[in-house]
């Protein structure tokens, strides 16, 4: 009962489909030290985080191109040619890092023999869905910033109007309502349900756990189904997770589904980016090390590391 929401949320898969190694990694990391158990929750909209990352790139001479989908690439030992939709001539680069989900990568790979090994690995992957339910109430329903809902379909509640305060007119500039986000990982049972059915289910469970919600009026609701949210960490899948290095010397892979040593979490995604960057610098002859060291074990956990 304790580990179910933790493992399903971290791995986005049902317990009977999760590999033992993936589950053990989550348990080991969460118990390694007090710092490892801390949960980070964004205190500002994710768009602001992304914009800050873009500013960082631009400040260092980089350029960001939006709304220009890449249709294909080809490469030799020293150069990559990238074909962008609606542009006649391919763009040329010294190196290419492909940071895409595994199914999107499959459609981008060249129709050459070099693509066969990575395509064979991709064929073993399956997706797992995550559903987010956003509810706006006309009054405060809880003083909690976040909560776990045990033994229910809803796994997590994030009180967004407390975590990211929305300033409104009146009430001394503070929002008088509640905006909450509910998260269901491995949400296979919700994919075929209608938006109305999901909202009704969510309301029933929220009102069960938060009595103040029973008197609140629902102002607005949104349901977001990420059908292909993460890869499924089934037994044996680690053997098919690729490293950043590909059959094309100047082309590298990144993504939470690659061989990071972590499951499909934000930490795993960040690690994949660091590993890809290290591979690029290695190929360029200026090796760099960017991967942050794991937190050291403390207390009794030092006996098991």
Model region roles, listed by residue range:
Residues 163-173, 226-253, 257-260:
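FAD-binding beta-loop-beta segment adjacent to the flavin cofactor pocket
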Residues 68-213, 224:
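Mid-domain catalytic core of redox enzymes
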Residues 281-305:
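Active-site-proximal substrate-binding core of FAD-dependent oxidoreductases
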Residues 10-11, 200-246, 297-298:
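Flavin (FAD/FMN) cofactor-binding core of flavoprotein oxidoreductases
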Residues 1-75, 79-80, 92:
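Active-site/ligand-binding neighborhood in enzyme catalytic cores
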Residues 63-67, 91, 219-222, 252:
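General small-molecule cofactor/ligand-binding pocket signal
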Residues 259-280, 284:
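A conserved FAD-binding loop/helix module that cradles the flavin
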Residues 57-60, 94, 277-285:
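Short, hydrophobic alpha-helical segments
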